[in-house]
């Protein structure tokens, strides 16, 4: 019996008194927040008899899962809370909770600015929400719990419920790199890895529910060092090999990585594990060694480019994506040109998340003199994004006429009457098809290429006899 199962089996008398809640969850930010939101719902369903609703006006409990990475994150949170306040005014039994990284950063300060909030919890304490909710429903004052209790939360979460053929699995929490611009170590704590057995148990549970693809999550996921049963530690490469052996799991992704800890075992996984997708998101942030040093990234641009060469040597079809920041304190036109030159040399055919630098409270970079004119920052961002757009568009056009293996994950967002899926290289493909195909792999011929999505016709579907290609170009 796993630790999760043994904890699950214990009745929680405090939570047993809680009325059934209709819960609405709104999530901001990264994939880790998406994962946390789903697990938050799982624990409320399991321990508090909750059910999820799709509209805030239907809810007894409104939860905002927040992100603090980008500019004005706090103001966005309080703006949303202000909009939700009317639900509480209309019905005083409605409770409002704030979780995620802004909650971790602000703590009880949220109650000072928004005294109508009932619950404040951090990423590491979301499993305690049923108890906090029960106390608040019983008449206690507003509840605040934003501690960093290491890996405790995973011991209290029920096994996840699959909602389609793809799923996120958190394998570690926190980050210990302390890049000068980044707030994550202060809101999610230092790196803590889940034991290998716990991760594999979660993946097996998902596979038994029909999941075909898992995305292993961590703020610095390639620093993973999970405990094995013999007390030794497994790196991310070994974990990927173990996940690939689980029946039913046919594709594996991971995110997000740091170049300074991309070890040889992970490169070997790209060589030896065919289930590992032809995709890598590896943030570089800048093409200037001076700026990388100010950012405290722990590597120079030559090391980044050498690493990419090593990975591409063992996985020639790799699609590469990254993160880039412009306008960091101390950056000049010369440093920005170095970033453009690096983009040209490396080639980010998978695109990039690119932003103008914004200081985050409490980080070392926030203390640096920011003498970069705002007009320069905006102009640099436009030039950078234009260059990245060219690369991504060219890579998409190069796929015209090729056949791609696509995991069909649901209706198309562009046209719900059609289907959609992703290639191994993480490219979205839309095509006509039968909803019964969802959860299967299909061979799709690419007939039209746009920067952010492809269109194709189905040539074959796993386990399906095909008499003719399905779909049309255009």
UniProtKB/Swiss-Prot annotation:
EC identifiers of the protein: 2.8.4.3
A single Gene Ontology MF term assigned here is:
metal ion binding
Q: Ranges for the MTTase N-terminal domain? A: 21-138
Sequence ranges assigned to domain TRAM in this UniProt record? 397-460
| Keyword Translocase assigned | no
Identify the residues that bind [4Fe-4S] cluster 2. 175, 179, 182
Compartment annotation? Cytoplasm
Return the HAMAP family for the record.
Answer: tRNA_metthiotr_MiaB
Family assignment? Belongs to the methylthiotransferase family. MiaB subfamily.
Identification of the protein by name? tRNA-2-methylthio-N(6)-dimethylallyladenosine synthase
The organism is: Halorhodospira halophila (strain DSM 244 / SL1) (Ectothiorhodospira halophila (strain DSM 244 / SL1))
């Amino acid at each position: 019996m796993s630790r999760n199962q043994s904890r699950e089996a214990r009745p929680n008398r405090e939570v047993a008194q809680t009325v059934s809640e209709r819960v609405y969850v709104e999530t901001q930010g990264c994939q880790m927040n998406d994962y946390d939101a789903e697990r938050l719902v799982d624990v409320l369903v399991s321990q508090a008899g909750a059910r999820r609703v799709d509209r805030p006006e239907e809810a007894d409990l409104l939860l905002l899962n927040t992100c603090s990475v980008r500019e004005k994150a706090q103001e966005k949170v309080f703006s949303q809370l202000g909009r939700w306040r009317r639900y509480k005014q209309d019905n005083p039994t409605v409770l409002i909770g704030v979780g995620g990284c802004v909650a971790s950063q602000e703590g009880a300060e949220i109650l000072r600015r928004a005294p109508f909030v009932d619950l404040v919890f951090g990423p590491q304490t979301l499993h305690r929400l049923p108890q906090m909710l029960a106390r608040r429903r019983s008449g206690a004052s507003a509840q605040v719990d934003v501690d960093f209790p290491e890996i405790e939360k995973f011991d209290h979460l029920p096994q996840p419920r699959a909602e389609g053929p793809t799923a996120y699995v958190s394998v570690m929490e926190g980050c210990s790199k302390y890049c000068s611009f980044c707030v994550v170590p202060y809101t999610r704590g230092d790196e803590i890895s889940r034991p290998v057995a716990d991760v594999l148990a979660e993946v097996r549970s998902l596979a038994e529910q029909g999941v075909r693809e898992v995305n292993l999550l961590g703020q610095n996921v390639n620093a993973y060092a999970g405990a094995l049963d013999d007390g030794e530690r497994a790196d991310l490469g070994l974990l990927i090999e173990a996940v690939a052996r689980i029946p039913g799991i046919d594709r594996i992704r991971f995110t997000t990585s740091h170049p300074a800890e991309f070890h040889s075992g992970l490169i070997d996984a790209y060589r030896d594990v065919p289930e590992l997708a032809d995709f890598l998101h590896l943030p570089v942030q800048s093409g200037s060694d001076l700026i990388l040093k100010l950012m405290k990234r722990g590597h120079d641009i030559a090391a980044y480019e050498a690493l990419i060469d090593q990975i591409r040597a063992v996985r020639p079809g790799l699609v590469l994506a990254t993160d880039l920041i412009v306008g960091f304190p101390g950056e000049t036109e010369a440093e920005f040109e170095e970033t453009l030159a690096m983009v040209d040399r490396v080639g980010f055919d998978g695109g990039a998340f690119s932003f103008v630098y914004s200081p985050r409270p409490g980080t070392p970079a926030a203390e640096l003199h920011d003498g970069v004119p705002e007009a320069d920052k905006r102009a640099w961002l436009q030039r950078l994004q234009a260059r990245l757009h060219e690369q991504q568009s060219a890579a998409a056009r190069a796929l015209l006429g090729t056949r791609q293996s696509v995991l069909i994950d649901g209706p198309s967002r562009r046209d719900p009457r059609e289907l959609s899926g992703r290639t191994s290289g993480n490219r979205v493909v839309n095509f006509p098809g039968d909803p019964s195909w969802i959860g299967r792999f299909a061979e799709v011929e690419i007939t039209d290429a746009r920067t952010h999505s492809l269109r194709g016709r189905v040539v074959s579907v796993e386990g399906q006899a095909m008499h003719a290609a399905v779909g049309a170009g255009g």
